[in-house]
Amino acid sequence: MIWQKLNQLQPKIKFKPQIILAIISLILAVGMSISISNKIPAQARTEKNYEEKLFETALSFTLYFEGGFSNHPADKGGRTYKGILQSVYNTYRRRRGLPPLDVTQMSDAELMEIYQGYWDNSRSATMHPALAVVMFDTAVNFGINNSVTFLQQALGLPQTGIFDTKTKEALAEGNNRNTALQMINERIIYRYKRVQEDASQMAFFHGWLARDYSLWGYVEKLKDN
């Protein structure tokens, strides 16, 4: 069982009571009254505006946790602004023939285009609403290939990090909320392993768990359509 795995990993971690309260507050803050296209009559809803609404729903959660600039010495990703690494921004500008620029100078239009890339390349739009939100947030937080790896773990597949035929077939059967929650479980397990392997990552541990448990609450309140 997943929670048995978690219990095996937890003993060395002291979880502060105030962190638990913060997690509960975050779940309540981001999880209330969430609905996808519930104000649009079903017969009038088009595929395009449904996808746009779903993207907005996913983005609203991710931006809640990716609000500002970070350059913590223990963060292996380095300089990060609104969830975008400096290295990712460098690649984005280079591919467009633009000169390098500090990530903190990134425009809102560039930010949205990069986020749209995460959405498209993770194939989130093809998924159940709950899974789409989790897949997108995982892609931003861990990278596209790693998001596929987490999905494969949740589906009980070999972890290749590639959206291959077996993954597509398994997703066709497991495109649901349970798979989304299983992905979050896999993220939590990964966090515990990460801090046990590298004590410097404890600086981020409580923030990571706040994000994961808040994501759990967020997707549980999503309507299926």
Q: What residue spans do the PLM features occupy?
A:
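Cell-wall polysaccharide-cleaving catalytic domain and substrate-binding groove, primarily
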Residues: 2-225
